[in-house]
């Protein structure tokens, strides 16, 4: 990226800035920074989605990891040749989309049947985000198990939690594979525990994310209204980065609901309960003395 930026400046005699802040996905493009810099175009490299552009000035550039999956897929296919899971859904994340078809061919050469789910919205066929799982969820009745191509425990565990199907993560860097359903059950128990802890809260902070693709003010206000009816005192908060350190600045709040990104609540450690949108919806059901049902078994957690 640094080299590309310098080449643009030399070839076209225009300023080219590298935005050095974190970027967690197409929900986190930092167009505010581009506007402040007076940039006419913003290139996002690597967060592959089904669209080439977002807004008028954002251009999405596909970039794939060049790691090869052949060894780990062969290893899985040979080790699991006699297993009961014969129809496999193949799923991956943005940087490994180019490995779907080669991996599919290997599995089918070993006698497995494979299914790659259709994309929806920003998702390509066979692609999942950390918060959206349409290509996995929509084929669950057609498959025995899922293969996730990549090293992301969060993505693979999310597939297992949203579908309750056997899910295997194939890691091409260490050429190892593992079933992640036990980890999914542990994570689900943690999410349920947070809900019951939040049930006891007197004052709940509802956090609105200020990143452009995570801004859900209407949903936050809807939760505010529902929880106030149920007797909770509500504090509305707006944050760009939701971290334990920043939440420590707020006093007298017993639990939080953040409507920005489900990964924040599920992935990170917080001293006080921090709920995602599905957890918040389950909390409202619990407060109404209703069963929370399968609150994570959804196509998306937004």
Where are these regions (language model features)?
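Conserved, well-structured core segments that form the ligand-binding/active-site neighborhood
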Residues: 53-184, 196
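Redox- and metal-dependent alpha/beta enzyme cores, enriched for Fe-S-associated oxidoreductases
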Residues: 154-234, 241-250
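Peripheral docking tails and interdomain loops at the edges
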Residues: 173-177, 182, 262-302
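Short, charged N-terminal beta->alpha structural module
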Residues: 1-15, 91-118, 209-236
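A C-terminal functional module that forms or caps the active site or interfaces directly
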Residues: 218-275, 280, 292-293
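Structural motif
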Residues: 40-41, 45-47, 63, 90-96, 144-145, 149-152, 255, ...
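Metallocofactor- and cofactor-centric catalytic cores in central/energy metabolism, strongly enriched
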Residues: 1-36, 41, 46, 243-246
């Amino acid at each position: 990226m640094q080299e590309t930026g310098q080449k643009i400046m030399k070839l076209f005699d225009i300023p080219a800035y590298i935005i050095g802040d974190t970027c967690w996905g197409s929900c986190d493009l930092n167009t505010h920074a581009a506007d402040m810099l007076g940039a006419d175009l913003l290139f996002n490299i690597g967060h592959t989605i089904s669209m080439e552009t977002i807004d008028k000035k954002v251009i999405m550039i596909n970039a794939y990891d060049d790691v090869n999956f052949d060894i780990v897929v062969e290893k899985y296919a040979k080790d699991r040749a006699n297993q009961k899971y014969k129809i496999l859904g193949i799923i991956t994340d943005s940087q490994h989309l180019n490995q779907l078809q080669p991996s599919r061919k290997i599995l089918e050469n070993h006698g497995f049947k494979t299914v790659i789910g259709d994309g929806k919205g920003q998702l390509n066929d066979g692609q999942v985000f950390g918060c959206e799982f349409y290509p996995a969820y929509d084929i669950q009745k057609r498959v025995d198990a899922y293969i996730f191509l990549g090293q992301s425990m969060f993505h693979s565990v999310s597939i297992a939690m949203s579908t309750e199907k056997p899910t295997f993560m194939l890691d091409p860097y260490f050429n190892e594979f593992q079933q992640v359903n036990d980890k999914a059950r542990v994570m689900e128990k943690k999410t349920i525990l947070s809900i019951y802890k939040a049930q006891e809260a007197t004052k709940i902070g509802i956090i609105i994310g200020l990143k452009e693709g995570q801004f859900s003010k209407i949903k936050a206000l809807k939760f505010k209204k529902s929880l106030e009816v149920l007797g909770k005192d509500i504090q509305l908060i707006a944050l760009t980065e939701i971290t334990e350190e920043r939440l420590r600045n707020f006093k007298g709040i017993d639990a939080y609901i953040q409507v920005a990104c489900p990964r924040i609540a599920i992935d990170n450690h917080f001293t006080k309960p921090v709920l995602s949108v599905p957890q918040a919806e389950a909390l409202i059901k619990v407060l109404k003395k209703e069963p929370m049902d399968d609150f994570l078994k959804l196509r998306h957690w937004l």
